[in-house]
Swiss-Prot record:
UniProt region (GTP cyclohydrolase II), positions on chain: 200-397
Active site: 327 (proton acceptor), 329 (nucleophile)
Note describing how the cofactor binds: Binds 2 divalent metal cations per subunit. Magnesium or manganese. Binds 1 zinc ion per subunit.
Cofactor dependency: Mg(2+); Mn(2+); Zn(2+)
Tree of life domain: Bacteria
Function according to Swiss-Prot or TrEMBL: Catalyzes the conversion of D-ribulose 5-phosphate to formate and 3,4-dihydroxy-2-butanone 4-phosphate.
Protein name (database record): Riboflavin biosynthesis protein RibBA
GO terms, molecular function: 3,4-dihydroxy-2-butanone-4-phosphate synthase activity; GTP binding; GTP cyclohydrolase II activity; magnesium ion binding; manganese ion binding; zinc ion binding
Region (DHBP synthase): 1-199
Species whose genome carries this gene: Bacillus cereus (strain B4264)
EC number(s) reported in the record: 4.1.99.12, 3.5.4.25
Binding site for Mg(2+) 1: 27
Gene from which this protein is expressed: ribBA
Catalyzed reaction equations: D-ribulose 5-phosphate = (2S)-2-hydroxy-3-oxobutyl phosphate + formate + H(+); GTP + 4 H2O = 2,5-diamino-6-hydroxy-4-(5-phosphoribosylamino)-pyrimidine + formate + 2 phosphate + 3 H(+)
Lineage, top ranks: Bacteria, Bacillati, Bacillota, Bacilli, Bacillales
Residue numbers binding Mg(2+) 2: 27, 141
Length: 397
């Protein structure tokens, strides 16, 4: 149904249009996307004839600064915070609306000699400023267009147009599939673009290494930063893990209430301590401590979820009521850290099959799942049962 990212890149380099779909829980839309560097009046005409949406030009912050493109509004209330600048027409155009003149405006926007004064405001081309970090920071068509341009080695700017059906409704995936077939266009998803970038780019940096004596033994502690956000992660390494043999690994998501305060609402603290003790006993292994508090929703939202649980919601329902998925964690950064440590084959300490799938999706081999079950407490029996029933955790309760 969808094409590989590599196939889309090849077509884009040839000046062709591709269709890019976002998540069904986001806009659930498809856009025509082309590279701004190769834009022609014919491509613009195709987009406005068969896409029927608004023609926009995703650009980097650098273009906006050079051309003095101010935000369209001072207070952006768009649900997805799409970063429209003031609309523009090049001064050489007349009305600016024809396919030819829109293409001219886009071509001049990319001209390194162009200045802010070379464009009339408002106009018929709508620049959008992509977030630094692209789809890894914001999973929108704006960022997808700029990322695709960069991956093609082209100027970091694209041309996009939403695809609307003939009856005026938004085209969804079944409609987009028919459109792609009709015009022989490659179709990809932003989700696949995110995965492609995570696989092909190094996003973590080894920052500092120390010796860390603990109650469970002495570990080699390595601190990591990553280019996606400000979160810092730490790997506690025991023994020689460079032998090529499968290594005992625990990927532990931060839980301040459980790890530090000993909360009985969860089993996180006991799992952390048990994992460290088991790695120490084996004399070799890694505990990767990921700053993904509350299955990725953050400390305050976790406390809000606890409040909802006190009102009768279970842990999954509470997350969803707050507007989050049941589990927001992503294992791409963790996988890159494990690869930086030289690991390929793991014996994974976990009760969570999704964690196994998440790591294996980044070319790490999990040859064994090592159970890490803690005795249930009265306060967390219901929580653990929900993890079994709704999240698929492998626990014997």
């Amino acid at each position: 149904m969808f094409h590989r990212i590599e196939e889309a890149l090849e077509d884009l380099k040839k000046g062709k249009v591709v269709i890019v779909c976002d998540d069904e829980n986001r806009e659930n839309e498809g856009d025509f996307i082309a590279l701004a560097e190769y834009i022609t009046p014919e491509t613009i005409n195709f987009m406005i004839t068969h896409g029927r949406g608004l023609v926009c030009v995703p650009i980097t912050e650098g273009y906006a600064e050079r051309l003095q493109l101010e935000p369209m509004v001072s207070h952006n209330t768009d649900s997805h915070h799409t970063a429209f600048t003031v609309s523009i027409d090049h001064v050489s155009t007349t009305t600016g609306i024809s396919a030819h003149e829109r293409a001219t405006t886009i071509q001049e926007l990319l001209n390194p000699a162009s200045k802010g004064a070379d464009f009339n405001r408002p106009g018929h081309i709508f620049p959008l400023i992509a977030k630094e970090g692209g789809v890894l920071r914001r999973a929108g068509h704006t960022e997808a267009a700029v990322d695709l341009a960069k991956l093609c080695g082209a100027e970091p700017a694209g041309v996009i147009c939403e695809i609307i059906n003939e009856d005026g409704t938004m085209a969804r995936v079944p409609d987009l599939i028919e459109c792609a077939k009709q015009f022989d266009i490659k179709m990809i998803t932003i989700e696949d673009l995110i995965a492609y970038r995570r696989h092909h780019e190094t996003l973590v940096t080894r920052e500092v290494e120390i010796t860390l004596p603990t109650d469970f033994g002495t570990f080699h502690a390595i601190g990591y930063s990553n280019s996606l956000d400000t979160k810092e992660h730490i790997a506690l390494v025991k023994g020689d893990i460079s032998t090529g043999e499968p290594v005992l690994v625990r990927v532990h998501s931060e839980c301040l209430t459980g790890d530090v305060f000993g909360s009985h609402r969860c089993d996180c603290g006991p799992q952390l301590h048990a994992a460290l003790a088991q790695i120490e006993r084996e004399g070799k292994g890694v505990l990767l401590y990921m700053r993904q508090e509350g299955r990725g929703i953050g400390l305050l939202n976790k406390l809000r979820a606890y409040k909802l649980q006190e009102e009768g919601f279970d842990t999954v329902e509470a997350n969803e009521k707050l507007g989050f998925p049941a589990d927001l964690r992503d294992y791409g950064i963790g996988a890159q850290i494990l690869k930086d440590l030289g690991l390929q084959s793991l014996r994974l300490l976990t009760n969570n099959p999704r964690k196994i799938a998440g790591l294996q999706g980044y070319d790490l081999e999990v040859i064994e799942r090592v159970p890490l079950q803690m005795p249930a407490k009265e306060e967390n029996k219901s929580y653990l049962q929900t993890k079994v029933n709704k999240l698929g955790h492998l626990l014997n309760l």
